[in-house]
Amino acid sequence: KYPEFTFVISQPQQLIWIKEHSNEMFERIKEYEKQGRIEIVGGAFVEFDTNVSGEEQLARQMLYGQKYYLENFGHYVNNLWLPDTFGYNGNLPQIIKHGGMNHFMTIKISWNRFNAFPYHNFIWEGIDGTRILSHLPPEGTYNSGASPKSLKSLNDNIEKNETIYNSLMIYGIGDGGGGPNEEHIERVRRINDLMCLNKVECGNVEKFFNGLEKKKNEMPIFKGELYLENHNGTYTSQSFNKQYNRKMEEKIK
């Protein structure tokens, strides 16, 4: 019904559960992925925490995620997709690169309480000097309504301090699950009829980043940790999370 629409799947663990529940559905997903109607993104096993996790755990996220995609879909993924993680440590660019990926997408940093993050398209440089092409969708949400109001908010935010206006609009019901529905897609179809707004093109994440690659020499460089000012005290007030995470890491070793 909507041949232009592409659905994104970002976590192999979800695919494992789908296959356990319905192998028929899993085979349909594989077929749709070949057709370009579904796009696998992320290159990691789940959308993981980067602050408490040790370096071995981070590396294994990439190892097992990419291994799963290669074995089940025949190829690796070229981007790390972490829309809702509470901050990103400064060694992550190096780990992303060693995981076979060249691109990074997050949304959460736009939730800073006091200091607005200054870039949407930028080069993230890790503490060792590794650089990753990165994108922060300017609407600042993974629950976009794909409405004229959504697009105007996106336009206003990116025009404040950007010279490269390419951006993702990630629409659907992202927090709590469900994804896009027909209403969202119908809005996207109609939104280009509004002459006062920038044009929207249905596509996929890899195509978007490949377009940004051509402009990366124009992008600013941000060095070090991507610190999230929101959700302060998450790890301090719930210290048992850190304790049990470390216990599990020791058991894995």
Give the label of every model feature segment.
Residues 1-253:
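Catalytic-domain carbohydrate-binding cleft regions of carbohydrate-active enzymes
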